[in-house]
Structure formats: structure tokens, C-alpha cells
Amino acid sequence: MNNMSIQEIVAAIKNKQPEIKTVYFVGCGASMSDLFPAKYFLENNAKKLRTSIYTANNFNYSTPAAVDNTSVVITCSLSGGTPETVAATKLARKLGAHVISITNKAGSPLDVEAEYCILHGFYESYGAKMEKPARALELACELLNEYEGYAHYDDMHVGLAKITDLINAAVPMFRPVAKKFAEENYNAPILYVPDDGNAVVKRNHLPFRRILPRTI
């Protein structure tokens, strides 16, 4: 594991590769969902950098031809042990890409296989659960600013610094509402989450009883 900050990681990549053409986001399940805000941010703000997102095995078995030393591949797994994501990390490095992993666990296979690693919190509080997508978004912002410039760079950092405390402060207010919703819908076999386009990170339909303990 390296102890580099996000700014240091991106600066190191820029020093080795002055031109980056593509940023790929790779993960599975919830970790893939947590990468969507960063992908959406680059997609809507970058003028030159291209971006796309892949499930890990899609990346492994239908690898984009453009993955090379002009690519940054960002892989994400909470445990750092998701086999498909670890394999994607190895593959991306083999193809010459600059690979950054995002995980909660230092020393995990994802940490070991990536060129750079960003560690995040998760279990400490409700707010800490936002660290994974927040670190991915911060990384996307840093890449954009380093390679193209980003007018709202400082504002982004101010906002990201407030997220954890804001969520933790809101938890007492929303816990009773969440508990009531969970109890009233406990027997619902499926919970559908409606969405509209890119405004929501991923469409999900989940057995409600599976998420009940986390809801309350």
C-alpha cells in the first residue's frame, strides 16, 4: 500500500503520462454503483477526457481496445477481495494502464495488485459509508483539474469535506422515518427504486427483507 494522497497520486500519473485520454471505472454490485457519481461527473464536465464504466467481468472478457498507457483504470471493492475486480486490476496493469484501487481494507488483494490505492472508511458511522463514492468523486475531480482544469475545483473540495458530518447530523432526524417505513413494508417481497436517467446511480430491485436490518 502507498500512503499517497489523491493529489499526489494524480500528480505522479501526470508526471509519467502527460496525456490521458480515457478514464475507466470498474467494479461489481454496490461498489460499481458507488462509482457512478464520479463517472457522471467526468461525463458532464470533461471536454477531452472520455469515460466509461464496466462491471469487472465485462471489463475482463470484453476489454476495451483503448486500454493502454493513456488510460486510468479505477477499480473499487469494499473488501478488496472481489475476485473479478482483482482480476480486472491485474489485467489493466498488464495492458499498461495507470491503475488506482479504492477499498476499505489495507493489504487486501486489490490494494496489492493496484499501482496506487485509496483507502476509505465505512463501518465507523453512517457518514463514513459515503466515503467510497466521495473518494471516487474527489479522484475524478482531481484528474479533470490536472489534465484540463476545473473552475469549481475548490468548491468541490469544500463540499466533499462536509458530507460525512452532514450525513451523521441528519441520521437522528431520519432514523424514526426509516424505521416506520421498514416496519410498514416488511412483507413487501420486492422493493423497487424508481429513477430517471443518469440522476440515479443504478436501477435496483431488491428483496426488501434483505435490506431491512440496514434500514433501521
Positions of the model-derived regions?
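Active-site phosphate/pyrophosphate-binding segments
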Residues: M1-K21, I118, E124-A128, R135-I216
